[in-house]
Amino acid sequence: MRVRILIAFAMLLTVPLPGLSRAQDASMGSGIKVNVTGFRNDKGQLGCSLWPGPQGFPRDDSHILKHIWAPIKNANGECVFGGIFPAGDYAVTLFHDENKNGKFDSNFIGYPLEGYGFSNNAKAQFAAPSFDECKFHYDGAGWKQISVKMIYR
């Protein structure tokens, strides 16, 4: 049991430090808001990652600009990436951490066991979509609002 707790804690440390913030960034005057719908239940939490470019997308967490955890209520969630971000193209990846273990669970062949989603509602066919399929433009001022629907397999 202690080993599992230590492993889970170690995995949480791999999330970039800015990601330790939660959804309270809404008090800031600008940023990116992601409305997420289609959860199959309200268990666990919503993990949201903001990517500033194609490098490492979507698997190398070291290239994530910001990661946050948000609650799920009535099959909906909202990720608020508040703060000053320069104008440019960004992408968002999300997952429904149903068991609240801080990671995206998959089976031994990589088949998703939890829900996930991408900005632009890009679909994963035999592989994850590319950054170009998921990117959206943020002009660097005010709030950019996007919507994503969760996918379950």
Predicted regions mapped to residue ranges:
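Sec/Tat signal peptide C-region and signal peptidase I cleavage site
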Residues: 17-25
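Short proline/glycine- and polar residue-rich coil/turn motifs
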Residues: 70-76, 137-140
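A short, amphipathic beta-strand motif
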Residues: 30-38, 48
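Extracellular beta-sheet/turn segments enriched in Thr/Pro/Gly and aliphatic residues
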Residues: 25, 115-153
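Acidic, glycine-anchored loop motifs typical of Ca2+
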Residues: 98-106
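Bacterial N-terminal signal peptides
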Residues: 7-16
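A short tyrosine-centered beta-strand micro-motif
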Residues: 88-94
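Exposed aromatic-hydrophobic patches
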Residues: 78-84
